[in-house]
From Swiss-Prot:
Keywords annotated in UniProt: Hydrolase, Protease, Signal, Thiol protease
Protein name, UniProt field: Hemoglobinase
Function of the protein: This protease is used by the parasite for degradation of the host globin.
A GO BP entry: proteolysis involved in protein catabolic process
Family that this chain belongs to: Belongs to the peptidase C13 family.
Length: 429
């Protein structure tokens, strides 16, 4: 009798937990039609060395379409300067691995060129028609998926001509939640220090589940960087891993946590992170990326295992080195060598500039108290803007982002923005 009672109590406990989960995250009856799913796909860079970002977005677009997301429910932002770039040996095509399957054809691009910026991105999320193109029209019963790929630095992600700071992004997410613009929201971000967009910032009560390519202090990695005909990298490691995971699985049987754990395992050069409402990990990926049970066709080349991976900030120099190696024209080779020399000098100048700023800061009195995360983010935004104005921008050279961590740490240690900005002005004018 005692054993039966214990068994009954256990069953009741399981049912209670299940009931609580189902109450919080009930699978919509509309799952089959996918009418309640929206996606925003963003490649936040331009320039041929950043080929991989637009290839990632194109690949992701086709996977979402194959899984049943309607084209009118997918919003894409990409500069669109790669497919027909003079440096692309395959005009009108973008590849995401060495199989050379074209992912560019058939992609509907909603925002191109100068329209790819942080302000337009936030307008798209808010459903603000002044964005000038397609915007999210999601409501309280809709599920939304956001994928962003580009460069980053502590507390920001980059666009071709500006940045999106973590605090502004979080403010927008809270706006979407309070205005019932979604039921559940999933965000995947590929960028250096991408974890800093959510760490200590994203609360667990917004029905948002986020994963990032890296933690808050490290680079993310690019992959397929050794193509015999294309001089730059074809994919980002984290991005390729999640896209292929979705491409090759029936998403009605694949949970968010299963995808996260597999992508984390396969992305072995950085530390993939998870933030927000982790209870959502029990939900199926199909609720956000489509429920059509279609994986890769039997006639398709199977996805490749990533190889030849390189830290994302090293890609511009890597691309230039490969261009030099692959050209047989002596005049072109000489010209490329001159460009390489200039880029190396600029890298050294950026490093020397930061060393001088650190030297100035070493003369300042160490603060007695650390800054809160809000204070840190406010400080870094001011400091980054000053550094961009007086010294260098992230768009000029990705390695700038690596030095932003020094400025971020000063803010976190409690130094005021005014003190740090004075040091920047003293060195950069």
């Amino acid at each position: 009798m005692m054993l039966f009672s214990l068994f009954l109590i256990s069953i009741l406990h399981i049912l209670l937990v299940k009931c609580q989960l189902d109450t919080n995250y009930e699978v919509s009856d509309e799952t089959v039609s996918d009418n309640n799913k929206w996606a925003v796909l963003v490649a936040g860079s331009n320039g041929y060395p950043n080929y991989r970002h637009q290839a990632d977005v194109c690949h992701a677009y086709h996977v979402l379409r194959s899984k049943g997301i309607k084209p009118e429910h997918i919003i894409t932002m990409m500069y669109d300067d790669i497919a027909y770039n003079l440096m692309n040996p395959f005009p009108g095509k973008l590849f995401n691995d060495y199989n050379h399957k074209d992912w560019y054809e058939g992609v509907v691009i909603d925002y191109r060129g100068k329209n790819v910026n942080s302000k337009t991105f936030l307008k798209v999320l808010k459903g603000d028609k002044s964005a000038g193109g397609k915007v999210l029209k999601s409501g309280k019963n809709d599920d939304v998926f956001i994928y962003f790929t580009d460069h980053g630095a502590p507390g920001l992600i980059a666009f071709p001509d500006d940045e999106l700071y973590a605090k502004e992004f979080m403010s927008t997410l809270k706006y979407l939640h309070s205005h019932k613009r979604y039921s559940k929201l999933v965000i995947y971000i590929e960028a250096n220090e991408s974890g800093s967009m959510f760490q200590q910032i994203l609360p667990s009560n917004l029905s948002i589940y986020a994963t990032t390519a890296a933690n808050s202090t490290e680079c993310s990695y690019s992959t397929f960087c050794g193509d015999p005909t294309i001089t730059t990298c074809l994919a980002d490691l984290y991005s390729y891993n999640w896209i292929v995971d979705s491409q090759t699985h029936h998403l009605t049987q694949r949970t968010l946590d299963q995808q996260y754990k597999e992508v984390k395992r396969e992305t072995d050069l950085s530390h993939v992170q998870r933030y927000g409402d982790t209870r959502m990990g029990k939900l199926y990926v199909s609720e956000f990326q489509g429920s059509r049970d279609k994986s890769s066709s039997e006639n398709d080349e199977p996805p490749m295992k990533p190889r030849h991976s390189i830290a994302s900030r090293d890609i511009p120099l890597h691309t230039l080195h490969r261009q030099i190696m692959m050209t047989n024209n002596a005049e072109d080779k000489s010209f490329l060598m001159q460009i390489l020399g200039l880029k190396l000098k600029r890298r050294d100048l950026i490093e020397d500039t930061m060393k001088l700023i650190v030297k100035v800061m070493n003369n300042e009195e160490i603060p007695n108290t650390k800054a809160t995360i809000d204070q840190t983010l406010d400080c870094t935004e001011s400091v980054y803007e000053q550094f961009k104005s007086k010294c260098f921008t992230l768009q000029q050279a990705p390695e700038v982002g690596g030095h932003f961590s020094t400025l971020y740490n000063y803010c976190a240690d409690g130094y005021t923005a005014e003190t740090i900005n004075e040091a920047i002005i003293k060195i950069c004018g």
